Amino acid sequence: MEYRRGDLLCQFIFWILWMIIKKLLNSHRVYGKSAAMPDKRDIAPQKQKWMMCLVLAVVTLALFWQVNQHDFINLDDPIYIHENHHIRSEISLENVYWAFSTKYAGVWYPLTWLSLMLDHQLYGLNAGGYHITNLVLHILSTLLLFWLLNRMTGSLWRSAFVAALFALHPLHVETVTWISKRKDVLSTFFWMLTLCLYVYYTEKPVIRRYIAVLVS
């Protein structure tokens, strides 16, 4: 059952990639004369942007895919997962309350605990699934960084270069491949998301966009 759940996540990842490909195929539509002209942040054609997202995702996935065969390690993983009965039990209001109210192993990481609970529901103690979750979060952060830089500068290739450097830099290997570093990939994801939403807010400062920034 644990391997079955891991297979489902892999299928979900490739489904996302397939949706990106479909978006590329449909991005050639011709706009009428009344369509709004893109501003300087939309210099690169949409097809190129989606293609770059696809390339970044596939390259990062290919580089780190082997982590799905890796196991837990003895540094922090046993304390965080094996010896933590809250992680190894079902997600419940009691466990959610514990995640937000308790300082465990000397740290307070409520979102990390919740994400590990969800992993345990999906994969049990199949370490590969936990590693893949880290990888998916890292890929999403990479794509958000690319969107952010391209939106701010309008420069496709420079934005892609910086995003690729972020995705593939050796300093990030530990973060992606060590399950106990879930806190890092989670915080990076929400940081990138917050920056993207803030840029979105500055383009049209309305209250709902500002609330989205605060929530993220």
Language-model regions, residue ranges each:
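Polytopic membrane enzymes that build or remodel cell-surface glycoconjugates and lipids
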Residues: 15-16, 20-216
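Intrinsic-disorder-associated, low-complexity terminal segments enriched in Asp/Asn/His/Tyr and depleted
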Residues: 3, 7, 26-28
